[in-house]
Amino acid sequence: VRKMHACETMGAITVICTDKTGTLTQNLMQVHEPNFYGLKDGGKLADDDISRLIAEGISANSTAFLEETGEGEKPKGVGNPTEVALLLWLNSQKRNYLELREGARVLDQLTFSTERKFMATLVKSPLIGKKVLYIKGAPEIVLGKCKEVILDGRRVDSVEYRSTVEAQLLGYQNMAMRTLGFAFRLVEDNEPDDCVALVSENNLNFLGVV
C-alpha cells in the first residue's frame, strides 16, 4: 500500500460491483460525441481544410492500427483503446487513416506519458505542403498550450473561450465520459523539428474535444 488512507477507504466499502466483459461492458471504446468547433457540423468531417487537418492529425499522431476482418465486419483495433476508437471513428467518416499516416512524414514525436498528459507529432504534411505540429491529450493541458480556438469561420482567444470548454468537459465528466483535446500549429521551415520546443511556446490552435 503506497498511501495509508487507501486502507481506510477499503475498510469502509460494503458493496463491490464487478463485471464480466460481455455482460455490461464490451472491452471496446468508441467515440460518443466529437465536438470540433471549426466544423459546421461538429461531429462530421467535410471537404475543407479543418477537416483535413483533423483527419491527418488523428492518423499521424497515433500508434494504434486497424486490422482488416471479414467482409461486412468492423475492423479490429490493435494498440491503445482510445486511439483505436479514434481510428474507427475516422473509418466511419470514410477517411483512410493508413494513407494519411503514410503520406505524412514524421519529423519528431513525443509519445504520451502520464506526466505530460499529451502526445505530440510533427509531420511534413502533403495536404498543405507545410510542417504541422499535432497534439492530443488531456483537454485542460492541451487548451493551456493554445493561443487561439478555431471556431467555424473565425478564431477566438483561448483564455476567453476556456470557460465554455470547461463547462462542456464538466458535462462529459458527469456522464462518465473520457475526453481528449486536440490542437495543431503550422510550423515554418526555419523552425526546429523539436516537439518539446514547439509545444512549450504555447502558441497552438485548439480544435475541440472528443
Regions found by a protein language model. Give the residues of each.
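Conserved cytosolic headpiece of P-type ATPases
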Residues: 1-210
